[in-house]
Amino acid sequence: MRVKICGITQPDQGVAIATLGADALGFICVSQSPRYVTPQQIQVVTQALPTQTLKGEPLTRIGVFANAALDLIQQTVEVGQLTGVQLHGDESPEFCQQVKAKLPKVELIKAFRVRSAETLAQITPYEAIANTLLLDAYTPQALGGTGHTWDWTLLKTFTPKLPWFLAGGLTPDNVTPAITTLTPSGIDLSSGVEQSPGNKDLQKVKQLFQQVHTLVI
């Protein structure tokens, strides 16, 4: 079970969350977001992070973009020392292919905001391009980090060819039924472990890992 904590803005919190057991940290590269961090701010955080997770695997550092230009994505990856790119907008399979060609060693995560079963049908063309999928709640006002949950039963028959993250309104209180119902490859949390946007609640993060540890033993 891969655990990604998204919306990291502060070096000390990033280090603490990695130390508590995170497999991946996410940095919001969408300027309209209250969790937005510049490439230089990301670099300050990533330089402070441990290189490995508690499992002894590489700690992945993911930049989250939405309908961004390819040059901006490449620059942010290089300056921020990122190991992954999450595309959370309306990026086409062709654009995803361009990202892969430009950044072949970087993990490509394609996110989908699920409105209905029809959204799941749109995923197929991306499975030959992306490394990982992420399924999030759909809200018209924001791209993510809203705290909104959604109808997870839509995913009961979801069997993609790629590993996938479940996101959207997850908290330490509801993560157990989410994981046991759907058995995703990973979970992605942001607002569910925050005091305010970009300010993580380390006690909630600790509770989350206690829940996950109980499930995977």
Curated annotation (Swiss-Prot):
Database matches in CDD domains: PRAI
GO biological process per UniProt: L-tryptophan biosynthetic process
One Pfam family, short name: PRAI
Protein origin, superkingdom: Bacteria
Segments traversing the membrane: none
Chemical reaction(s) catalysed: N-(5-phospho-beta-D-ribosyl)anthranilate = 1-(2-carboxyphenylamino)-1-deoxy-D-ribulose 5-phosphate
Name of the top EC class for this enzyme: isomerase
InterPro entries: Aldolase_TIM, PRAI_dom, RibuloseP-bd_barrel, TrpF_fam
Known EC number: 5.3.1.24
UniProt-listed SUPFAM superfamilies: Ribulose-phoshate binding barrel
Entry keyword set: Amino-acid biosynthesis, Aromatic amino acid biosynthesis, Isomerase, Tryptophan biosynthesis
Pathways involved: Amino-acid biosynthesis; L-tryptophan biosynthesis; L-tryptophan from chorismate: step 3/5
Family: Belongs to the TrpF family.
The protein's name in its UniProt record: N-(5'-phosphoribosyl)anthranilate isomerase
